[in-house]
Design a protein with these regions (language model features):
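Active-site His/acidic residue clusters
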Residues: 141-153, 169-215
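Bacterial Sec-dependent N-terminal signal peptides
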Residues: 14-42
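Catalytic-site neighborhoods of secreted/periplasmic enzymes
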Residues: 100-163
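Metal-dependent active-site segment of extracytoplasmic phospho-/sulfohydrolases and closely related
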Residues: 43-44, 62, 212-252
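Short, structured active-site-proximal loop/turn typified by the sulfatase FGly-forming signature C/S-X-P-X-R
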Residues: 53-89, 96-97
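Structural recognition of the beta-strand scaffold that forms the well-ordered cores
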Residues: 42-46, 53, 73-77, 91-94, ...
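Substrate-binding rim/cap in mid-to-C-terminal beta-strand-loop elements of soluble/periplasmic
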Residues: 88-96, 253-295, 308
Length: 309
């Protein structure tokens, strides 16, 4: 009996020394699809290192004007994860769970739990017989570690922002090499400018990079508008970011220039929650809600909420 007690104590001691991870009490369940929903599409434009106070009429005229439209949800106070690395924040945006669940705590992605907390596209692929999910990124770890084999198409090598934009145009206009129903884009050069010169609306290199991205975003939005008007396609449009920045870094999680960023959601016929401040886990459930996909597993696992009313 004493030997048994000693063995149990040793086991408890070993377990207590391991890094604590949340216990997943959610079970896999059937994914349900609202069959009244058809022809819904989603474009997510991800801009790495977007400091909120750089969204001005002079620097980003298109996004500045978009933010005040009646059919847009916008906040400059969108909450990042407490861990302000890129890895944890893109992971939370794309899985709908906080970093202590998906266990991405830096940009190495070591110990990630995407098999338990997969990206939202996993549920779309489970619900729809035929859906084309795709991702084009400048920062390739998003495709390598988060998306892995979950999507139908991902860019295979690191691209610069101009190449991301051109590849997105090819997909959206030409349907080449795939005609996307749900498309995620990632622009990284703003973050690079911040690290090299400073994250600030007073830094010319940061400003010029953001102005260039604003032109890309306007062009992408116009393509979506044409698809809505000419082809009858029903697109939900997002602009999101992983973190802001201050000086040449974004490690101070207490700094509002770092732990707050922008979040846009636009649709001509939807209403969004007023006076609600989004966080990184709200993107995924909003998309699944719009696409008519639900399950007990999703409700159990995801920390965020849909901002669609």
């Amino acid at each position: 009996m004493k030997k048994l007690l000693l063995l149990l104590l040793c086991v408890l001691c070993f377990v207590s020394c391991e890094k604590d991870l949340p216990i997943n009490l959610c079970v896999e369940s059937e994914v349900f699809l609202d069959t009244t929903i058809s022809n819904h599409n989603v474009l997510i434009v991800g801009i790495d290192g977007f400091r909120s106070d750089a969204l001005t009429e002079d620097i980003t005229p298109f996004m500045y004007n978009l933010s005040s439209r009646d059919d847009v949800y916008f906040t400059p106070f969108h909450k990042t994860e407490e861990d302000t690395y890129s890895g944890p924040n893109w992971s939370s945006l794309l899985t709908g769970v906080h970093y202590y669940k998906h266990n991405v705590v830096d940009n190495s992605f070591v110990g990630s739990r995407f098999s338990t907390y997969p990206p939202f596209q996993y549920y779309l692929e489970s619900a729809y017989q035929q859906i084309n999910t795709s991702s084009i990124t400048n920062w390739n770890p998003i495709n390598t570690y988060i998306y892995q084999q979950y999507l139908d198409y991902t860019s295979e090598s690191t691209l610069n922002d101009s190449m991301v934009f051109q590849s997105a145009r090819d997909l959206l206009i030409e349907g080449y090499p795939i005609d996307p129903d749900v498309l995620f884009l990632h622009f990284d050069e703003l973050d690079a400018a911040g690290h090299s010169f400073g994250f600030s609306p007073e830094v010319s290199e940061y400003v010029s990079t953001l102005s260039k991205i604003d032109v890309f975003v306007e062009s992408l939005f116009n393509i979506i508008e044409e698809k809505r008007n000419d082809l009858g396609e029903d697109w939900l449009f997002f602009i999101v970011s992983d973190h802001g920045g201050d000086g040449t870094g974004h490690g101070d999680a207490e700094n509002p220039h770092i732990n707050q960023t922008i979040f846009f959601s636009q649709h001509p016929d939807l209403s969004f929650k007023p006076n609600y401040i989004t966080n990184q886990t709200d993107l995924s459930p909003t998309i699944l809600d719009y696409m008519g996909v639900d399950s007990e597993e999703i409700d159990c696992k995801m920390d965020g909420i849909s901002i669609i009313e």
